[in-house]
Amino acid sequence: MKKNTVSEMDQRLGYKFLVPDPKAGVFYRPLHFQYVSYSNFILHRLHEILTVKRPLLSFKNNTERIMIEISNVKVTPPDYSPIIASIKGKSYDALATFTVNIFKEVMTKEGISITKISSYEGKDSHLIKIPLLIGYGNKNPLDTAKYLVPNVIGGVFINKQSVEKVGINLVEKITTWPKFRVVKPNSFTFSFSSVSPPNVLPTRYRHYKISLDISQLEASNISSTKTFITVNIVLLSQYLSRVSLEFIRRSLSYDMPPEVVYLVNAIIDSAKRLTESITDFDIDTYINDLVEAEHIKQKSQLTINEFKYEMLHNFLPHMNYTPDQLKGFYMISLLRKFLYCIYHTSRYPDRDSMVCHRILTYGKYFETLAHDELENYIGNIRNDIMNNHKNRGTYAVNIHVLTTPGLNHAFSSLLSGKFKKSDGSYRTHPHYSWMQNISIPRSVGFYPDQVKISKMFSVRKYHPSQYLYFCSSDVPERGPQVGLVSQLSVLSSITNILTSEYLDLEKKICEYIRSYYKDDISYFETGFPITIENALVASLNPNMICDFVTDFRRRKRMGFFGNLEVGITLVRDHMNEIRINIGAGRLVRPFLVVDNGELMTDVCPELESRLDDMTFSDIQKEFPHVIEMVDIDQFTFSNVCESVQKFRMMSKDERKQYDLCDFPAEFRDGYVASSLVGINHNSGPRAILGCAQAKQAISCLSSDIRNKIDNGIHLMYPERPIVISKALETSKIAANCFGQHVTIALMSYKGINQEDGIIIKKQFIQRGGLDIVTAKKHQVEIPLENFNNKERDRSNAYSKLESNGLVRLNAFLESGDAMARNISSRTLEDDFARDNQISFDVSEKYTDMYKSRVERVQVELTDKVKVRVLTMKERRPILGDKFTTRTSQKGTVAYIADETELPYDENGITPDVIINSTSIFSRKTISMLIEVILTAAYSTKPYNNKGENRPVCFPSSNETSIDAYMQFAKQCYEYSNPKLSEEELSDKIFCEKILYDPETDKPYESKVFFGPIYYLRLRHLTQDKATVRCRGKKTKLIRQANEGRKRGGGIKFGEMERDCLIAHGAANTITEVLKDSEEDYQDVYICENCGDIAAQIKSINTCLRCSKLNLSPLLTKIDTTHVSKVFLTQMNARGVKVKLDFERRPPSFYKPLDKVDLKPSFLV
């Protein structure tokens, strides 16, 4: 879209965010945060994690220690792009090496003596192999161990080795706000987690729980399993902060409702009673006694002083380097929230709110794995040293332990859908279309097991915290993922930050806070606590909070702190806190700034004239107070106006209540929803269904499909959509196409296109309309001896193989053809046989219903021969294939009509597709009609006044009235043909045409809606789903049809189908289908005495039960199905006796004859 199509300033500013910003290093906005996350991990974070120096073991009161040091960490990313990697045939990944030194430190009078135990210099380039966003496999296609056919230059893209398959961004389990829970009436808990900052490695986690029972206020304790003592929360706060109980009372009661003040007084009084119950109470002695009791309880091998230091020093790891007094004031602030939340739960962020969670991006996945595997690696070394010392008396390490850090296996498991050992599996996502390459990395969801374990059923609802940051339309409509996966809106991203940047930013913020007068930031009794990533740094004078937050936001926008994504949240509503967030994993998006009741875009008139030549980073630099990056925490506790139009309609006093203003509605959708048109003009469910169908649309992949041995469906003749949105254009979804323009007619056609049925023109199909090509990977593993077996096999399945045992290039595979030689030979134990060796074919066959051409063959020779075959097939639309518009008007091909059968207009043009007209009324998709009208108007005037092509802007969610679009179409037609009459102009605008009956050549009485639209073909194809068959494979046990279409399975003809035929009186058909044909009937002998199935011993049938009792059984032969016999046998094996009994009635030929009276009738 060109410049002159945008008129509103807020819309133009939103568009500036979507386009690339090379000055800020943003070349592709939708996935920029993923690229930054991964590059930060590879270039910086991995080096920090692997650089380790710490003790493994300690002896003799810590005077002797076994130390480990990992140094010389070298991470080598590739010097070329993924495309160059493909041309070179290289793998696009990063390699890491390091050196491990293990030595013994002994503390002597002269100093510390060091004795080397073992070392390993990791020179192997594959010691740690980190897959990047794209993985090109097999190193070099010319390698003799692995060969390709055709053997040409070009890498082979293997999707399973790519990080693209990782899938959605998971929501962290740890919450940044404490979790409030009602255990039972009058019993509550307040749980929170403390995580060490990123510069502290290894990362320390502590989880605490504050319990409060109204009936036992003395037991208002804080506890943590094995990491902290169980102690009264008020007394702990007093111990750490060194203040009186009256100070704590005043701090908790300040600015609280009366009901909360009453509870505060009760808790403080209970703490006083607890202290008075102990003779000569001293807070230090009380805490020391609890620590000693915990030391005895845990049977710790540490000394009491070491145990106490370990417990209290590591209390609240996120405030590790903070004085204990600040830790005490932090506990008081937590207790304030807890007590307030008991009475006003709805005002506190619940556990399902996105305010409470951070999000794991792709780089964070691998960072977490690197942490865990490094600890496992060091633990294995420690255990090996202990075992060697125990068994041999020496401190030594096996070289195998040093050379297997285990990171490669963990990374491979991640790409297979295994994140952590304790978290179970999650679904991986192969990316088959350009739209999925964007939508999946921008999806946010929960752990699959997280919902089950935590019983978090409420997360399935659309949470208010997701508003503006998540797309409300692109959510799963069915299945286990409903409500658990959300799509980011086009303006949303996830923050990333380096450790060095984190420390510098924290230092600058602390210096800014301490620049205030000392007394103003030391209001610990009645002030507002200021926290940086939940770490308390100061407490501000309540009279200065507004000025502080306003000044902080202004300095942030001006670049004073060097980071524009800092979040500052002013939490009022009696909880009284100023939260400053700087960490990674936060959701952020831009907002328009409102300062003192003025929209800053209105205060900067020169911005409009310069906007066209500026990037988004230029706007942030030269006009810093126009736009602010706001995280979801700050947004939740700020006053945000819905739109600029509503803001300008308010009075001056109302405007001063707002802090921010949102962009137009189109920026609240995700990229998938942006591919739709006018969803606000349709019914609500159409948006959700439309997003699901758009992701199933067949598009054109950018990677080389001939070199990519992977499944995929590709549109052969794609067209760029005419009616688009800015997000669709900037994300390159429009340029990479996902459909074609077709001419549709909304009408009934001979009763064929009922419901979702559509009529498609035969000549349109023959010209390549919506034609696709299917690329499919077939992979088989063959034992090496079977592959090299040269025995002849008479099987017709080998007719497409060459002499090397592989399928020929350009061969057309049919169902039953083998893709590689797999002949198994067996020797018979028969001395009299002339040829006692037999061979038989065990190869896997091609099972698809359609023929495919062999495009590429790859072989990997190891202990087994792995053969990968890439087949291609052009597939034109057939009956049963699914199509849809971008307004969720799906249709299934019901009839393929010849052009002579279709109605035509005055120019002889026939529709390509006929859609049932009643579907518009039932599904209320008005925007589909608007799309047709706009597309037709574009065809009349495709260029603007400067001669440039201009697509039509029709965003997915827009605030433009339908009349405005009608006026646009009217101007297009008046410009191209100014002599049109009013009726002709109206018909042109509303795409109404008179069509002629092909049989009578007479016009229809009513006009028909007739025009072009962008039509999508879905990946639901008939030949991929068909499973019904008459003959095929069966299982060995019950001889039923196999399950699954890929295994040649079919649909079982069972009881319900039988009942249908019985109802129609088809007794013979039932017998043939159920017994003779499908289930293989079998003769069975039944004992009439006991009802058992007779056993066959040396070709003699006998009843085992009766023979043991010396009875003479009477065996009766019946015919039944094989599966019935298997069922009875299995039931008997489980101790369940099923007796087959016979109906006792005399046969008809033994019945006495009726008496016949032979007397003449006249004598009677």
From Swiss-Prot:
Reactions catalysed: RNA(n) + a ribonucleoside 5'-triphosphate = RNA(n+1) + diphosphate
Could you confirm whether the keyword Nucleotidyltransferase appears in this record?
yes
Q: Name one GO biological process term.
A: DNA-templated transcription
**What sort of enzyme, by top EC class, is this?**
transferase
State the EC number(s).
2.7.7.6
Q: Which controlled-vocabulary keywords does the entry list?
A: DNA-directed RNA polymerase, Metal-binding, Nucleotidyltransferase, Transcription, Transferase, Virion
Q: Which domain of life is it from?
A: Viruses
Q: Where in the cell is it found?
A: Virion
Entry keyword Zinc: no
Q: Which PANTHER family match?
A: DNA-DIRECTED RNA POLYMERASE I SUBUNIT 2 (PTHR20856)
Write out the similarity annotation: Belongs to the RNA polymerase beta chain family.
The record describes its quaternary structure and partners as: The DNA-dependent RNA polymerase used for intermediate and late genes expression consists of eight subunits (147) kDa, (133) kDa, (35) kDa, (30) kDa, (22) kDa, (19) kDa, (18) kDa and (7) kDa totalling more than 500 kDa in mass. The same holoenzyme, with the addition of the transcription-specificity factor RAP94, is used for early gene expression.
Q: What is this protein called?
A: DNA-directed RNA polymerase 132 kDa polypeptide
Record the organism.
Monkeypox virus (strain Zaire-96-I-16) (MPX)
